[in-house]
């Protein structure tokens, strides 16, 4: 009944999920295509009841926000082959105070970084590694799984492969990721290769290495990743009472996440769980903005750029692999692409921290785009907004400390909270508090 296969995004070519393939014969990206007619054998209300019951279940698959929607992910994967670290079901933070400050109807922040390895990449990696685990058990010769990474993908790959007992290899741009991101794959036992290049250089090499099918590619050009990441849409819909907000803002680098967000929303529309489309807004750092540039030229073509250094290091990407899917997402969802400066992303992240968040710089990019678009009235006062927060702020402690210590190059912090050093006397403390309270 439920069935999925790889399908070209630009043609009719299909391939079984058991085949190791990342593009069609003409070089176009693939997607996982489902038999959606089988989904309609249940009514929307029946799906709501089923998914609601799984939310309170302690069955291993149901403890995962991804696998609790398994009929829409990899429906034919045996339960015993699933490799899960209880990913998903991340909190939806009500940022109403910030919504009032910028005069919009409502604002929530989806905290995808509240996950096992601290980023949304867990959602896609559970699907990819589970399928690899299944293929190996079926006798496919796979020696290792490999990825190029700006930090978060490598952390997710290494953890899930460690859980499954599958060797992993990560290619990192030397000196360009945080200590927290670097230590994760090291700790989980990955083969860690630091290359004297940027992410795009690492991506080029890993594609050549994985041309040998015995080393499996784990980057988001592998459409299995998108199947896990699309469940962000399902979770949002369920958490908001089976509706989606008017606007969803998501940071964009390699653009797999926006592709996934659109695909998940397509699914919800196809099932009949929602009727109204949200607008999807992609936010890029000014220093790594090829998608923004293409958008401003009405998507005539993608012109790769040499990404400059940005505090939002995970999206420091100049040649995004998932560009074709992301372009279609923006067109289908009445979307906007915005860019923000280093100053804007830094201040936006720390402005949000003042209401109880602890934002990574990439979330700062999304928030900065929201603030800019609200000022332009591209987002109206009557609209509800959700920000997709892609990683946990604890992975970027240097960014947080540097902002408050005012040591970030080129940044003049608007919301810095300096430590006050005082003599160890009650009088000195009381005098200082009189000035501060």
Feature-to-residue mapping (PLM):
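PLP-dependent amino-acid enzyme catalytic core
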Residues: 1-437
């Amino acid at each position: 009944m439920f069935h999925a296969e790889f399908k070209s995004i630009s043609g009719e070519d299909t391939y079984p999920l058991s085949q190791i393939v990342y593009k069609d014969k003409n070089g176009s990206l693939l997607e996982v295509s489902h038999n959606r007619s089988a989904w309609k054998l249940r009514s929307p209300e029946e799906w709501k009841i089923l998914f609601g019951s799984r939310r309170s279940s302690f069955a291993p698959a149901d403890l995962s926000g991804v696998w609790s929607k398994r009929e829409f992910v990899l429906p034919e994967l045996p339960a015993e082959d699933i490799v899960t670290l209880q990913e998903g079901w991340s909190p939806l933070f009500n940022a109403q105070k910030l919504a009032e400050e910028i005069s919009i109807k409502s604002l929530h922040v989806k905290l995808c970084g509240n996950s096992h390895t601290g980023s949304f990449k867990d959602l896609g990696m559970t699907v990819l590694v589970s399928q690899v685990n299944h293929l190996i058990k079926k006798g496919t010769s796979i020696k290792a799984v490999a990825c190029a990474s700006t930090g978060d993908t490598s952390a997710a790959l290494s953890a899930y492969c460690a859980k499954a007992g599958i060797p992993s290899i990560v290619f990192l741009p030397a000196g360009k990721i945080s200590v927290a991101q670097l230590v994760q794959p090291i700790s989980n036992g990955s083969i860690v290769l630091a290359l004297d290049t940027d992410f795009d250089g690492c991506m080029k090499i890993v594609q050549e290495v994985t041309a040998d099918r015995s080393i499996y590619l784990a980057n988001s050009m592998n459409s299995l990743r998108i199947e896990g990441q699309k469940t962000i849409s399902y979770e949002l819909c369920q958490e908001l009472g089976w509706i989606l907000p008017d606007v969803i803002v998501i940071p964009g680098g390699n653009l797999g996440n926006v592709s996934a967000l659109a695909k998940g929303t397509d699914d919800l529309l196809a099932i009949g769980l929602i009727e109204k489309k949200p607008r999807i807004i992609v936010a890029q750092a000014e220093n790594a903005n090829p998608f923004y540039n293409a958008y401003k030229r009405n998507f005539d073509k993608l012109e790769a750029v040499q990404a400059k250094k940005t505090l939002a290091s995970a999206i420091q990407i100049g040649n995004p692999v998932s560009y074709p899917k992301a372009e279609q997402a923006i067109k289908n969802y009445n979307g906007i692409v915005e860019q923000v400066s280093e100053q804007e992303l830094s201040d936006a992240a720390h402005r949000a921290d003042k209401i109880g968040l602890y934002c990574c710089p990439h979330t700062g990019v999304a928030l900065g785009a929201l603030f800019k678009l609200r000022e332009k009235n591209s987002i109206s006062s009557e609209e509800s907004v959700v920000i997709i927060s892609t990683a946990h702020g604890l992975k970027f402690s240097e960014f947080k400390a540097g902002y408050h210590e005012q040591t970030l190059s080129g940044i003049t912090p608007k919301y810095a909270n300096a430590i006050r050093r005082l003599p160890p006397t009650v009088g000195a403390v009381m005098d200082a508090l009189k000035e501060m309270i």
